[in-house]
Amino acid sequence: MAVVTLIPTLARALSKHSLLSPLPSVTSFRRFYRGDSPTDSQKDMIEIPLPPWQERTDESIETKRARLLYESRKRGMLENCILLSLFAKEYLHNMTEKQLNLYDRLINEPSNDWDIYYWATEAKPAPEIFENEVMELLREFAKNKNKEQRLRAPDLEYLFEKPH
């Protein structure tokens, strides 16, 4: 009998205090979709200022190649990890110092990895400063004309193979 009288009392207490009136201490959350739709105002985005890119002039060419190989493999998104690491495997060892500097600028100056991906796949035009021979090489590489399977970054064993 006590349980039967408790339930209506509990129901009245809950309906009066928590279900019908909002609690002042509860914060409501909203989800934002961050897409690149034409109506996206980007007011929900916070831009974090990054220090400007600076060319490393005190670096040997071997050190630069090693750093660029590492930076090509360790990106902020899987798509660029795969694309840039395979590109680096194919081209980095034959690049001139000028091309290495262009590639360094390309992968390190933009603050958004998606921009690099969109430029390489020609989904968006690249800014004039990045329109150069290295960007052309990257775009051609991204087309994958040989229809290679590109599902992951390459293993590093190729670095230890003797040149043919």
UniProtKB/Swiss-Prot annotation:
Domain of life: Eukaryota
Pfam families in alphabetical order: Sdh5
An individual GO BP term: mitochondrial electron transport, succinate to ubiquinone
Subcellular location: Mitochondrion matrix
Record keyword Ribonucleoprotein present: no
This protein's record includes keyword Mitochondrion: yes
Transmembrane segments: none
GO cellular component: mitochondrial matrix; mitochondrion
Residue span of the annotated presequence: 1-27
Primary location class: mitochondrion
InterPro entries: SDH, SDH_sf, SDHAF2
Keywords attached to this entry: Chaperone, Mitochondrion, Transit peptide
Family: Belongs to the SDHAF2 family.
Assembly information from the UniProt record: Interacts with SDHA within the SDH catalytic dimer.
Function: Plays an essential role in the assembly of succinate dehydrogenase (SDH), an enzyme complex (also referred to as respiratory complex II) that is a component of both the tricarboxylic acid (TCA) cycle and the mitochondrial electron transport chain, and which couples the oxidation of succinate to fumarate with the reduction of ubiquinone (coenzyme Q) to ubiquinol. Required for flavinylation (covalent attachment of FAD) of the flavoprotein subunit SDHA of the SDH catalytic dimer.
Protein name: Succinate dehydrogenase assembly factor 2, mitochondrial
Gene that encodes the chain: Sdhaf2
